[in-house]
Amino acid sequence: MIEAVFPQAREWGALFTSVSKIVDEISVSFKKEGVSARAMDNAHLSMVDFYIPKNAFETYTVIEEANLGIKLDDLNSVLKRATKNDKLRLSFDPSENSLVLAFISQIKREFVVNLIELGSNTPPMPNLSYEVTAIADPTALKEAVKDVGVVSDFATFEAEPNALYIKSKSSRGSVSLEFTKESGYLLDYQVKSDKKKIRASYGIKYLEYITSVDEAVSVSISFSNSAPLKLEYQIPGDIKLSFLLAPRADDE
């Protein structure tokens, strides 16, 4: 039996809309310490991972831990109906193959989402160390990716001691965007290397997917030479949402 009340229903909508850019269905784990999920896209280019601790909920009761297979189109259709002041109540009874979602404000609206059977194998999180870590404004990152998409199908992240660049070039032209702490777009910036430049390139389509996160207050950007990109978003309600994206195979 699972019963939980989350204070901001729309934050759940933002979370699962972002997850659905990478996967169509996911197994969500309800454990005594919180809610989590991790999945990889079909092309094995990107991984999504999120965690919501139990103390983020107004009430949280898990008598029996469970992994719930959810079709994201079905869940998002419901979560899109949340309004600004709605709380979200979640309930699951093992005898029923469904998740009950109720929006609670002046009136109570209750929806039932049927669950699906999914394998219980969760992909392991790679143990990666990064030479560059930056805390950035999420909207600025999203707009930078859109700017790069105007001229190219990939973006190169390049770190210098005092600035992070996102750039690209193609037969259509070139683009370069500079992020610094002085500009206000970087809240923190660390380069743990004495190399002159650290760079890696990533496909623009996936970058557009993993930077279109609504409601986030900050994003941590981590990368190394020709290594997977890690984006970790902090969403209100103590929700942590992370993406890993493989570098381009022909990255130089």
Show the residue positions of the predicted features.
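Phosphate/anion-contacting hairpin/loop surfaces
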Residues: A155
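DNA polymerase sliding clamps and clamp-related checkpoint/processivity subunits
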Residues: M1-S20, E25-V150, E158-E252
